[in-house]
Amino acid sequence: MSRIGKKPVPLPKGVTASISGQSIEVKGPKGTRSFSATDDVTLALDEGSVKVTPRGTSKRARQQWGMVRSQVENLVTGVTSGFKKELEISGVGYRAQMAGNVLKLSLGYSHDVNFEVPAGVTVTTPKQTEITVEGIDQQLVGQVAANIREWRRPEPYKGKGIRYKDEFIFRKEGKKK
């Protein structure tokens, strides 16, 4: 069993945390994030770090211990460096461009797809075939990237579609004559 919860979460310079009850608020150079922990764990500030300890020895308390510690670490990472997902578009005529707060995708449909970018996330298109999703909330960044990818997932024969930059597409062989 993992013992990741034992390790305290260090707070780098420029980051402050405040705990009230079961909720923690972390402020940093990129913004402010808060998280509400379950009743199975306790949160405590300890000399420039946040400690998470389980209440009791139940299985659920031990499970929540590591999970809450990872969530707090993600809060700290988000307000210091942020999170980033990069997507690539491959296919003839497939392209993306930003128009205000709307991402316009040309993906081979009879119409362009207009994707409304939610608050808390910034989407940029460095090239017509690249999309970058950035923000301080890891879950929201990943969800927005997944929603964009869902419009045209990569297909296994030619590899056309929207894929993550580091994603490997398993290619299939076509029919043989």
Swiss-Prot record:
One of its GO terms (biological process) is cytoplasmic translation. InterPro entries: Ribosomal_uL6-like, Ribosomal_uL6-like_a/b-dom_sf, Ribosomal_uL6_a/b-dom, Ribosomal_uL6_bac-type, Ribosomal_uL6_CS. It holds the Pfam family Ribosomal_L6. Keywords: Ribonucleoprotein, Ribosomal protein, RNA-binding, rRNA-binding. The keyword Cytoplasm does not apply. GO terms for molecular function: rRNA binding; structural constituent of ribosome. Disulfide bonds: none annotated. PROSITE patterns: RIBOSOMAL_L6_1. Gene3D superfamilies: Ribosomal protein L6, alpha-beta domain (3.90.930.12). The keyword Secreted does not apply. One of its GO terms (cellular component) is cytosolic large ribosomal subunit. Part of the 50S ribosomal subunit. Belongs to the universal ribosomal protein uL6 family. This protein binds to the 23S rRNA, and is important in its secondary structure. It is located near the subunit interface in the base of the L7/L12 stalk, and near the tRNA binding site of the peptidyltransferase center. This is Large ribosomal subunit protein uL6. It comes from Cereibacter sphaeroides (strain ATCC 17023 / DSM 158 / JCM 6121 / CCUG 31486 / LMG 2827 / NBRC 12203 / NCIMB 8253 / ATH 2.4.1.) (Rhodobacter sphaeroides).
